[in-house]
Amino acid sequence: MTITPQQLIALLPLLIVGLTVVVVMLGIAWRRDHFINATLTVIGLNLALLSLYFVGQAGPMDVTPLLRVDGYSMFYTGLVILASLATCTFAYPWLVGYPDNREEFYLLVLIATLGGILLASANHLASLFLGIELISLPLFGLVGYAYRQKRPLEAAIKYMLLSAAASSFLLFGMALLYAESGDLSLAGLGKSLQENMMHQPLVLAGMGMMIVGLGFKLSLVPFQLWTPDVYQGAPAPVSTFLATASKIAIFAVVMRLFLYAPAADNEALRMVLSIIAVCSILFGNLMAISQTNIKRLLGYSSIAHLGYLLVALIAVQTHQLSLETAGVYLAGYLFSSLGAFGVVSLMSSPYRGPDADSLFSYRGLFWHKPILSAVMTVMMLSLAGIPMTLGFIGKFFVIAMGVSAHLWWLTGAVVLGSAIGLYYYLRVTVSLFLSAPEALQRDTPNNWALTAGGVVVLISAALVLLLGVYPQPLITLVQMAQPMF
């Protein structure tokens, strides 16, 4: 097939990130310089982000049978690149004191970003699987990057073994669907499934196995057991990527899959998804209550947040508002998580081994670093869904969509989960303002707000507050980011 200039423009983010991977690889081979390779990575990701403007000018199109570039893919590509940029920014000071090779970290983040961009544009089960593997494989290395410590190594092994099992379920499910429908493209699959095939045992088994595989990647109950251990064990900048870019990219492709394949029309599958959503919301929130480790707490809370998003997924076939809900919620979740994990990254350094992730480390932070603790407070309030924050707008959309789609049980679970969530988010917030322990040593530099990581954290906090008060620009952007049919 011949590729036109228009199609090349549509693939610009993918091509630029791919080229950056090659450039950084050659840079590492030529000369090991942490600053140069980090700068090349950030320049490449910024160019990929800027190229989305030109992609928008080219208009929506099917570049190949595997990739569909439209407003929807551009929006989620933008979110993934922003998360990757933030990860690299937080990682730079964290890696400065790292005793081993530092440059490969950026290479792995770039390859995972490539997978995220591929997932955002995936229009075929083959590109879906390739994207998921491309985002998962570098994460094994990233999670265990501080391999001299026991925790990251243990987290990497757990994540690798369970991820391999989940991928095999996903692939087996795809094979069963292909055996029944004879098509791997999402549109062709949807067309086959609409012709009264949703009750075929092979199709139900295939969809069930795919839900198992994708449920693991999104850390939904009962496939969530790896989440708190991996979040706690992974270095703070890696936990940032795991919580944001990885989840957003995979949820975007699952949403597109459900748009075509009428899985939620089948009563049995709809019931299974509803049970998974309710269990994820309740389990995530209830388990987070007793946590004393902030990364572990955020890991459990991410299970609950994906449970809330599942409400939008269940209604995606019947309700136009569900796409808008997912977009607004994921944008709010991205900025809130970047801020929260960013503060943990700024508080941590590999000089003394483990990250500053114990809740005790944050006790009385306000009296030493008032602006940093104010940022953390804003992020916790946003994740809890308190009004005047972007998190509230996302929760409002989820509840409004649940009510208009008559999903009463799920809406009730969202309200109950949000009420439980208030307790542990406010627990973190209150600890910031308690009297500080005298013997506690903190690694955060006094000029943290002037560092690149500090700037990212402050911008995230500003966006959470500004879009919480005036969300119309984000809502307009999400409304423009509609998938092409």
From Swiss-Prot:
Pfam families: Proton_antipo_M. It is found in: Cell inner membrane. Coiled coil: none annotated. Its main location: membrane. It catalyses: a quinone + NADH + 5 H(+)(in) = a quinol + NAD(+) + 4 H(+)(out). The chain crosses the membrane at residues 8-28, 35-55, 78-98, 104-124, 125-145, 159-179, 203-223, 235-255, 271-291, 297-317, 327-347, 374-394, 408-427, 449-469. InterPro entries: NADH-Q_OxRdtase_suN/2, ND/Mrp_TM. Disulfide bonds: none annotated. Keywords: Cell inner membrane, Cell membrane, Membrane, NAD, Quinone, Translocase, Transmembrane, Transmembrane helix, Transport, Ubiquinone. HAMAP family: NDH1_NuoN_1. Belongs to the complex I subunit 2 family. This is NADH-quinone oxidoreductase subunit N. It comes from Serratia proteamaculans (strain 568). The lineage of its organism: Bacteria, Pseudomonadati, Pseudomonadota, Gammaproteobacteria, Enterobacterales. The gene is nuoN.
